[in-house]
Amino acid sequence: EISYLSYRKEPKDWYRVDRFYNRIAPEKVGEVYASCDILIKTSIVESFSYPPLEMMATGGVSVVVPNGGNVEYLKDDYNCLFYRQGDIDAGVAAVEKLLNDKKLRDKIIKNGQKTAQAYQWSKLEQRIVDIYK
């Protein structure tokens, strides 16, 4: 089953989408992520990029194109799997790898949850305060 979450536009006609979420209220986003197993993030340019972090917090895994914003906290084969932008076959292979390798999937989930814990707002607030001290 494939879900598509967007704040701007509907999926293209050729996308195979079972569920489409548009403009989800912030307090409901976690529920959407928790209903999914794998996040595929294809953005090539972003700032910090929260979706993989949100997916980790809900116990899911991410297959991601590395970009300036997400490489601050994502590590290939540690808390996500990377694939090269535009290489659809590599993206599919990464998803299949996660589906077929429970040990890898469990490792990425565990490390992803550690990463998400490190980026909780309360911890980030303290890090910002420490910078100004």
Residue ranges of model-derived segments:
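Short alpha-helical segment that forms part of, or immediately flanks, the ligand-binding pocket
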Residues: 30, 53-57, 71-72
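A charged, aromatic-enriched C-terminal amphipathic alpha-helix characteristic of glycosyltransferases
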Residues: 103-132
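Conserved acidic donor-binding segment of nucleotide-sugar-dependent glycosyltransferases
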Residues: 76-77, 81-88, 97-102
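Aromatic "clamp/platform" in nucleotide-sugar-dependent glycosyltransferases that forms part
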Residues: 44
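Short alpha-helical donor nucleotide-sugar binding micro-motif in glycosyltransferases
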Residues: 31-36
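Short hydrophobic beta-strand element within catalytic cores of glycosyltransferases
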Residues: 61-64
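A short hydrophobic beta-strand element within the catalytic core of glycosyltransferases
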Residues: 39-40
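Nucleotide-activated donor-binding/catalytic signature segment of Leloir-type glycosyltransferases, i.e.
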Residues: 4-30
